[in-house]
Amino acid sequence: MDKSKRTFRKSKRSFRRRLPPIGSGDRIDYRNMSLISRFISEQGKILSRRVNRLTLKQQRLITIAIKQARILSSLPFLNNEKQFERTESTPRTTGTRARKKKIGLLLN
C-alpha cells in the first residue's frame, strides 16, 4: 500500500471523565443554599454554564433558584465587601479658574 493512500490515524488518548457537579439526589431548590452557593462567584454573580459544567436544563433551574433566593433575601444580590472599606479622600480643588473667568466677565 502506498504511503499517500494510507489513512492517517491519530492515537486516541484516554481521558478521565469529570463527575457532574450536581448529583442525582441533589434537589435544585432555592432553599438548598449549599448547592446554590457552589454556582455563584465571589462577587455574587451567577457563573456561566461552561464554568459550572452543567446541562442547559440544570443551568436554567440553578439560575431560577438563585433568583428566587435573592428575592426572598436568603442570598444577597451583590457580595460587596468593599462597600464598607474606607477609601482615602482626595483633596478637592477650589475653582480658582472659574472665579477668574467670572471676575473677568464682570470687569468687561
Swiss-Prot record:
Region entry Disordered, spans: 1-23, 83-108
Keyword check for Chloroplast, yes or no.
yes
**PROSITE patterns tied to this protein:** RIBOSOMAL_S18 (PS00057)
Output the GO biological process annotations, alphabetical, semicolon-separated.
translation
Which residues are the signal sequence here? none
Q: Keywords assigned by UniProt? A: Chloroplast, Plastid, Ribonucleoprotein, Ribosomal protein, RNA-binding, rRNA-binding
The record's Gene Ontology cellular component field reads: chloroplast; mitochondrial small ribosomal subunit
Annotated GO molecular function terms are: small ribosomal subunit rRNA binding; structural constituent of ribosome
Q: Where in the cell is it found?
A: Plastid, Chloroplast
Task: Report biased composition (Basic residues) as residue ranges.
Answer: 1-19, 97-108
Instruction: Tell me one Pfam family matched here.
Output: Ribosomal_S18
Q: Which HAMAP family match?
A: Ribosomal_bS18 (MF_00270)
The UniProt entry, under PANTHER family, shows:
30S RIBOSOMAL PROTEIN S18, SMALL RIBOSOMAL SUBUNIT PROTEIN BS18M
Family, according to the entry, reads as follows: Belongs to the bacterial ribosomal protein bS18 family.
Report quaternary structure and partners.
Part of the 30S ribosomal subunit.
Q: What is this protein called?
A: Small ribosomal subunit protein bS18c
Q: Which organism is it from?
A: Illicium oligandrum (Star anise)
